Amino acid sequence: MSAPSVITIDGPAGAGKSTLGELLARRLGYLFFDTGVMYRALAWAVLHGAIDPEDGEAVTALARDLDIQVLPPGDAMDGRLYTVLVNGVDVTWELRHPDVERIVSITARHPAVRTVMRERQRAIGSRGRVVMVGRDIGSIVMPDAPLKIYLDASIDERARRRTDEILRRGGDADLQRIRNDMIRRDSLDRYVSAPAADACTIISDGLSPEQVVALVIARIADRCDDSQEARA
């Protein structure tokens, strides 16, 4: 089976995009690139720089100056899927803090900010052999990607997953607060997180990560069969 050179996975927060992306990339031997961590890293820097997240000019200037690196987890044994450095500082787990969650959509919605980030994301995607996870990857960043997945789940399922994730790390999490934050973020992101017209939509409620991966692998196999028939 020959997998597509670029696979994009979009969807709302808590749908399981990062888990699917990491498992799929490992299965295929591809690079896993969660583009959302770039926006979270920027939001973290906005908070620590005491910058108004509504100030598009200031946030854009910060985005241009930041050194954001997304690296393999290395020897870390804390369950992380990747390591995120901002100007050399490991902020991986801080990016899931509720304060970051509350402003990430505000900082990311500035058009100039998204332009800066998309250019960086597109450069990585153009190398091929990559699974890219985000909200607008298939529709805007990599519109010519040969396989696009839109992963979704109910708001209750997504909030439960995010709560469980925080609790597993020993943090404090309030299910209702997380649910409300997700609803608010969905409203802010509704213009950038719509699925691409040619995306394959998967609803992950009640499915294990392995079951979702199996659905995507089946989709890849179907594409390969269609391609072989077209060449015959």
UniProtKB/Swiss-Prot annotation:
GO terms for cellular component: cytoplasm. It is an enzyme of class 2 (transferase). Pfam families: Cytidylate_kin (PF02224). The keyword Cytoplasm applies. Its EC number is 2.7.4.25. It comes from the Bacteria. ATP binds at residues 11-19. InterPro entries: Cytidylate_kin, Cytidylate_kinase_dom, P-loop_NTPase. It is found in: Cytoplasm. The keyword Transferase applies. One of its GO terms (biological process) is pyrimidine nucleotide metabolic process. GO terms for molecular function: ATP binding; CMP kinase activity; dCMP kinase activity. Keywords: ATP-binding, Cytoplasm, Kinase, Nucleotide-binding, Transferase. It catalyses: CMP + ATP = CDP + ADP; dCMP + ATP = dCDP + ADP. Gene3D superfamilies: P-loop containing nucleotide triphosphate hydrolases. Belongs to the cytidylate kinase family. Type 1 subfamily. This is Cytidylate kinase. It comes from Roseiflexus castenholzii (strain DSM 13941 / HLO8).
